[in-house]
Amino acid sequence: MKIFAIGMNYTEHNKSLHGTLSKPERPVIFTKADSALLNNGKPFFIPDHLGRIEYETEVVVRISKLGKTIPQRFAHRYYDAVTVGIDFTAREMQKKLREAGQPWELAKGFDGSAVIGEWVDIQKFRDIQALHFRLDLNDKTVQEGCTSDMLYKVDEIISYISQYFTLKTGDLLYTGCPTGCGPVNIDDHLVAYLEDRKVLDFHCK
């Protein structure tokens, strides 16, 4: 199983990073180790050696069939379910890595950093590019977005990634986060929603 993720893919989050909207020439792709996956409502144990850990709330797509060099017009045939996940990030470390021109994996791919919610059949939704989602932290909404605000759409991303990697059943795609990232602390309670459906519920330890 491979875990792909996209950076700077939402309009307002992109602006907050650059001061103005700066669409990358191509999608910004990074990966997480399979040991990053955290599911079934298991608690997230905050690492004590990575500094400030922040949540990034994202729509996640599940790949459902083998594919390579997939044309964009056929990309919708290669995923079957969607949910909300958290891309936990060691923010201070990521900043240092970016400044040094180094990859982000140490700040993004550590154990437990890819939290995943309950899968929902893609057929439940009319348009994957019109999904509203949000994160509640200790009963307060702290991050919300809509997939219509993506700079690169799901089918574009899948087509692009498949030019370099063979996609396999069960691979995951974290599609980027809206503005509103923030820190987590021990005993925090995180609940995420896809439209009005609760798909993720876990605690930090």
Q: Model-flagged regions — what are they?
A:
Residues 1-168, 172, 180-205:
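Catalytic-core "active-site belt" of small-molecule-metabolizing enzymes
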